[in-house]
Structure formats: C-alpha cells, structure tokens
Amino acid sequence: PGSKENNGCPELSGEIVKSLNEFGSRINFPANSYQILGRKTIENLEKIKNLLEENQEGNLIIEGYASSDGDEDYNVELSIKRAQAVLEYLVKLGVPETRLEVIGFGEENPLEDNETSLGRAINRRVQFKSKR
C-alpha cells in the first residue's frame, strides 16, 4: 500500500519520475498545436509507456505547458489539450487511463525565456509527476 497522502495508492519513485521527465523533455509542440508529431516524440512516448509497464505501481500526472504566445485563457486551454493528447497516445499504446491524470498550466513555470523563439519552443511541452 501507498502513503496516506496518496489515498493508499503507491507512488512512482523519484527515479522513475526523473526518467519520465528526461523522455518528456523531448516532447515539444509547434506553436498553437497539440498534435503528437515526429519520430523522436513517438519514440519517447513509447519509452514512457515501457517504463510505466515495468513499474505497475503508482499513477502519473501529465502536465501541459504553453509559451507566452496568445492570451492566458487560450494558453491554459492549449496546455490541457497537449497533456490530453499525450494521455490519449499513451492509452492507445496500452497504458490504462486510470493511471493517468491531466493538468494544464498555460504559460506558467517556463523553462526558458519566452522572449526568444528558442525559449518559446522549449516552453511548449509536457512534464510528468507522480500522482499524490
């Protein structure tokens, strides 16, 4: 059994979440898009699926993010759609939907400066957390 904070459900270890984010950091999106595109993105989603299969204990939060292009409400909606697209792809690969949850943060918590095109590209991403 897992912790009280996690309603008795087991959590994914910090090491597993770190590995998930290493793959997830390579899941980026074009501006105004939530489509899963590119061979590398698909390979990384398959690696994430394999990691979850190897570690049946614990659930995952998929966090969606956007760059500062567009207004705040639009960016929150877009970030949710990005996280949802990743959820749907993982489910298609065989991950049970009950192990996944989606949150959209819009342009909050940028990894890079939104003043540069490279920074905005990096900020259009998903990240993962163990569900507590």
Q: For the regions a protein language model found, what residue spans apply to each?
A:
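Periplasmic peptidoglycan-binding/tethering modules of Gram-negative envelope proteins
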Residues: 1-59
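Periplasmic OmpA-like peptidoglycan-binding domain that tethers envelope proteins to the cell wall
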Residues: 39, 63-132
